Amino acid sequence: IRMMRIPTPYGAWKKDKDDSSIMAKGDPGDADGDFYDIYVEGNFEAFDGDENLKEKKEDWSLDFNRNYPYGWFPENRQAGAGKYPLSNPETKAMADWIIEHPNIGGVSTNHTSGGIILYPPGTRPSTAVSEKDINQFIEIANMGKEELGYEPLNIYDSFIADPANYDSGAFDDWCYQSQGIVAYTVELWDLAKRVGVPLVWNARNKESAQDELKRFVACMKWVKENAPEYYEDWKPFHHETFGDIEIGGFNFKFSQQNPPESFLNGVLEQMTRFMIRFAQSMPRLTIDTLTSEKVSDDIYKVTAIVG
């Protein structure tokens, strides 16, 4: 899946003056030159040639990380939440399994992309929960930083954009705030950091369009040099709705969202080392001493010190 650029005098995008393969936002008031609309490659519904342009709806539009009970909000606040908490059989099965296994001490839900290690809470500031818990979250996450190079971030303090209207119902929040389990969401693959223009993850501090373009250009250059099979130059294409357009750009799924295939094993090896260290940090049941004393025939007193 690539991008489509469609010529239109009403478009918000222009070809970059230094590199025509790059699309940049036009300046307000700029009316000179060629303009384009940019969409993900695909078809559209209810298009009458002028208005009512609507991309095809996803078949299910479910987001499992909005369907867990803790902090759940309905669809009118967050898309993908489902009809009610645990309405999806997959999330219900996960919750049931965890509840049935009280020996679980830690979980990690592994996402793409971004190159960060997120930890709860995501529904309130980190200062509102146990300081001991937060210190433990940071201490274990720093193991991940050593292995992966990813920064640990609290979800509420440093990741969400709107503290008054945040999305919730996430797996990690439910694990921690409902079940008392140490839980992380690891966003694997850090292309922006690799190209030297890392993302600013405090989402409340919006970066400029110039910084976004700088990172995009650097990412495109990196992909062309290191994974050229995941980039295509713009090529003419006849679209059934828009006529003559162009299709090209990144294969987003395997360049920015996930590592290119040749980089996948390296990321997985780093993540595996973190997960092993995470598991080794959990409490382990041991029997320190075990003694027996004969009380009478066929009766013994057994003493065990469990630590």
Residues of each region from the PLM?
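Metallocarboxypeptidase
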Residues: 1-295, 300-307
